[in-house]
């Protein structure tokens, strides 16, 4: 009976780890066709709005030098000019298809992550008793560690999150989240988040040491400062 009670929280922890992956896999397969049909139908009605048209034109300009194209058009005979215009038309259609695929990818990933968040929130609320047992296990495990190991672990985590080399890790993680949600890569937003998050975490961590650790385990704070120095 005791083994069964111990197995249930472990099963709950395992399900929390793998459930987001399963939800993402199922939602991607089930929603992709529906979102594609919805987007293509909507595009037939509106074709390109101003933002989409600007995006397509910017991509086209990146590949072709318009000034050189004008000179080439003047030198081409009529038959070659028609073929050239036909090639430009096909290339523009290809740009539009790529643009639509990108928009579908964005909507699909955002919808999948939103559904995963709702399902996980409901699942956590439904099994909050098992979550409480897991929390007690973690607290008991941390309580049995020595103050030296605790201080070393805190120092390791803080150096990884807010240390000198942490911005590169934050850049990779935030970039992965952006990609997972299907958002475009914006260097200014990414730089702002990378420069802001470590500062916020550092402030929260110092406040936590001041308010919690000093009251619970003063010796741990002393060891931490000794190792940090």
UniProtKB/Swiss-Prot annotation:
Annotated catalysed reactions: K(+)(in) + H(+)(out) = K(+)(out) + H(+)(in)
One of the Pfam families matching this protein, by short name: CemA
Bilayer-crossing regions: 6-26, 107-127, 189-209
Gene encoding the protein: cemA
Species for this entry: Crucihimalaya wallichii
Gene Ontology biological-process annotations: potassium ion transport
Entry membrane topology: Multi-pass membrane protein
Task of the protein: Contributes to K(+)/H(+) antiport activity by supporting proton efflux to control proton extrusion and homeostasis in chloroplasts in a light-dependent manner to modulate photosynthesis. Prevents excessive induction of non-photochemical quenching (NPQ) under continuous-light conditions. Indirectly promotes efficient inorganic carbon uptake into chloroplasts.
Taxonomic classification: Eukaryota, Viridiplantae, Streptophyta, Embryophyta, Tracheophyta
Subcellular location: Plastid, Chloroplast inner membrane
Protein name according to UniProt: Potassium/proton antiporter CemA
Superkingdom in the source lineage: Eukaryota
Entry keyword set: Antiport, Chloroplast, Hydrogen ion transport, Ion transport, Membrane, Plastid, Plastid inner membrane, Potassium, Potassium transport, Transmembrane, Transmembrane helix, Transport
Covalent S-S links between cysteines: none
GO molecular function per UniProt: antiporter activity; proton transmembrane transporter activity
Any single GO CC term annotated in Swiss-Prot or TrEMBL for this entry: chloroplast inner membrane
InterPro entries, A to Z: CemA
The family this protein is said to belong to: Belongs to the CemA family.
């Amino acid at each position: 009976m005791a083994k069964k009670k111990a197995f249930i929280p472990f099963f709950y922890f395992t399900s929390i780890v793998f459930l987001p992956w399963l939800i993402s896999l199922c939602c991607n397969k089930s929603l992709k066709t529906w979102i594609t049909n919805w987007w293509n139908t909507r595009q037939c009605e509106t074709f390109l709005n101003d933002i989409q048209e600007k995006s397509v034109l910017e991509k086209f300009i990146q590949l072709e030098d318009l000034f050189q194209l004008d000179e080439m058009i003047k030198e081409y005979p009529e038959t070659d000019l028609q073929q050239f215009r036909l090639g430009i038309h096909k290339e523009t259609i290809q740009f539009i298809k790529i643009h639509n695929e990108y928009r579908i990818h964005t909507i699909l990933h955002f919808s999948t992550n939103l559904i995963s968040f709702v399902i996980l929130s409901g699942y956590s609320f439904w099994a909050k008793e098992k979550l409480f047992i897991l929390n007690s296990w973690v607290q008991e495990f941390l309580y049995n560690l020595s103050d030296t190991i605790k201080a070393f672990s805190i120092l390791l985590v803080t150096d990884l999150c807010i240390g000198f080399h942490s911005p590169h890790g934050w850049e990779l993680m935030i970039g992965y989240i952006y990609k997972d949600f299907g958002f475009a890569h914006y260097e200014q937003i990414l730089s702002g988040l990378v420069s802001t998050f470590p500062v916020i975490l550092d402030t929260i961590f110092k406040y936590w040491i001041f308010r919690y650790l000093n009251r619970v385990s003063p010796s741990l704070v002393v060891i931490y400062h000794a190792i940090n120095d």
